[in-house]
Amino acid sequence: LAWLDKLKAALPDIVIENCSSGGGRIEPKRMGMVSMCSFSDAHECAEIPFVAANVSRVIPARQSQIWAVLREKDTPSRTVYSLCAAMMGRICLSGDVLDMSKEKVALIQEGLSFYAQVKDIVAEGDIADIDCNIEYYRAPFGRQIYQKRLGDRLLVLIHALQDPSAVEVPLPGYRPLRAYTDCAWTFEGGVLRLAAAQETPVGFSFAEGLRPLSGQDMIFRAGAFLFEKS
């Protein structure tokens, strides 16, 4: 910590990232001395949104650097899933971002444009709810609904993995302003509904979860939604 003091004295404008180190360095004193912190050692795994939601209770979102590792081979659903996960904090882009198709670049730019509109909610808002029914992260099956509120505006991040069921979020008194998703969705009667997947997952049950068979893709569904009080 004394070394950090010397570094900041020598370079007052330096931006310091605190390496997560498995969570060992996420403590108030050190976090008060750095600009940002890797939210976790999780890098490309499907569990990132669930880990990020848990860590949001410990690290302020304005300091929580969340990986969005984007690959050219990823489906559009996987790309949206990764970007929406990173919207719980400071987006850290990685992967094949300099070598992607025009269509994939456009999808990423759309997500970053949405994030620019809600980043004040991310940084300064209060967590309104984290509803996650996934019981085993290493073979996740289920969905998570993350809500953050700032004034009259509400950010809703939905992640569904392997579970093909529709996801419904009651939001009485709100109206939608913008969405970032590749899934079909509706907002009727004060209920946000992410449509059911068209696929059925294939895998084997493991510790209250579902592991895909070798060569079988996971079913990724996600969306970021901005609402305001009506």
Predicted regions and their residues:
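Carbohydrate-binding surface patches
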Residues: 136-175
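Short, Gly/Pro- and small/polar-rich lid/capping loops
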Residues: 8, 131-133, 220
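Short secondary-structure junctions
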Residues: 125-129, 133-135, 176-182
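A glycine-rich phosphate-binding loop feature that marks nucleotide/adenosyl-phosphate handling sites
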Residues: 17-26, 101-105, 129-137
